[in-house]
Amino acid sequence: DTTAGLPVEEPPRIALTFDDGPNARYTPMLLDGLKKRNIRASFFLIGENIEGNEDILLQMRKDGHLIGNHTWDHVQLDKIPAEKARLEIEKTNNRIYEASGIYPSYVRPPFGAWIKDMELSVTMLPVFWDVDTLDWQSKNIDSILSIAQKQVHDGSIILMHDGYQTSVDAALKIADLFY
């Protein structure tokens, strides 16, 4: 595309990803904001957080978001026996299926700690990230936006969380900037 003979700069293609949900208070706000912008994201869910939030999973599915696994209770997989790690993932997969009718194909290992051999035993692909907004730590919209603006490039996978108001607000501002 060109405008007056000048190339039109395309915004970078990015993936917004959210860990640790679903959160009864903040995830619905995030889903509403994404829907208004016609944006699909990836949500990596903690199994024990699904109880009582099944309607949120159904909304995620209805809106076309990717639903992934983030273990049952946010354990660092490379610090526990392989069988326990497999069960963390399997239990969460089963709970996601019970709540949404789909088995996830992707897993986001907490802390990015993945055991390569697990791909064979759980038949899932790990999803990592290259932009960590540290939203869970700073809980500051300006700080989160600054990190995103400095680090995002075409193909970036942005790590955020859907359990804080500041994260929801920052995510929607990031969406407005890059989509």
Language model segments and positions:
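Catalytic domains of cell-wall/extracellular-matrix polysaccharide-remodeling enzymes
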Residues: 29, 51, 75-179
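Active-site beta->alpha N-cap acidic-glycine motif
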Residues: 1-80, 84-91, 95-98, 102-103, ...
